[in-house]
């Protein structure tokens, strides 16, 4: 059961035992759609398949968002500057996939960033995405320098869509190198799009762009019908599965 009368501005209150979401098109002008529920794997998969994602602070209830416009990126259109290409070609960094998910998400939560006070990746979020990784739906890319983890990213994969969640670096360009490695993997495996979610200057420089939410939802509806690459992407054990969204 979904209830909207308890909250202002038509923000929906999610029931604990029902995983349905209201249409993403019903979100407020700033993108907030619903409040409550939980971070169970079932609810998260339904959310991402519906163009919705959780984003909240430790001292807040779970908040669910669907932004308009939506930032996306095609893996084939990643922009690599000459200096970054030189860094990649130098092989001073090495990359892997799904070899250290727990550490990547913990670093994303803990590494300080400019113009950001605290983190939205709270302990419950960390636990939830670790479980999604165990189930084969959440994935990480790791960047190493002299065997030290210095950058990385993580996100959720459904159909031919990769939903990027967060990235970090402790050494210049390490997260960009991770993004390049991700795009190479996605291209090889015929992924169509990366859901960047929020419009940021950093990702615009990397080749991302915004589209109206209604257009994003149309693309998403098509792309999630494709088989999902479920499992560990790094050890060759992942298999293509048709994920049925109930």
Where are these regions (language model features)?
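N-acyltransferase acceptor-side catalytic subdomain
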Residues: 1-246
């Amino acid at each position: 059961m979904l209830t909207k009368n308890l909250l202002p501005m038509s923000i929906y209150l999610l029931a604990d035992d029902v995983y349905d979401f209201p249409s993403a098109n019903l979100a407020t002008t700033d993108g907030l759609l619903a409040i409550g529920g939980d971070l169970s794997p079932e609810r998260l998969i339904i959310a991402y398949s519906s163009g919705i994602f959780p984003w909240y602070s430790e001292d807040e209830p779970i908040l669910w968002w669907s932004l308009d416009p939506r930032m996306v990126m095609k893996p084939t259109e990643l922009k690599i500057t000459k200096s970054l290409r030189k860094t990649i070609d130098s092989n001073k960094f090495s990359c892997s996939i799904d070899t250290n998910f727990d550490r990547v998400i913990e670093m994303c939560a803990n590494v300080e960033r400019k113009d950001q006070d605290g983190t939205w990746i709270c302990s419950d979020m960390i636990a939830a995405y670790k479980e999604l990784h165990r189930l084969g739906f959440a994935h990480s890319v790791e960047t190493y320098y002299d065997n030290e983890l210095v950058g990385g990213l993580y996100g959720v994969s459904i159909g031919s869509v990769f939903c990027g969640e967060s990235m970090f670096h402790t050494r210049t360009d390490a997260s960009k190198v991770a993004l390049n490695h991700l795009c190479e993997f996605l291209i090889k495996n015929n992924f169509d799009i990366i859901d960047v979610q929020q419009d940021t200057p950093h990702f615009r420089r990397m080749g991302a762009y915004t589209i109206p939410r209604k257009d994003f939802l149309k693309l998403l509806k098509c792309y999630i019908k494709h088989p999902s690459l479920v499992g560990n992407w790094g050890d060759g054990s992942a298999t293509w599965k048709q994920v049925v969204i109930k």
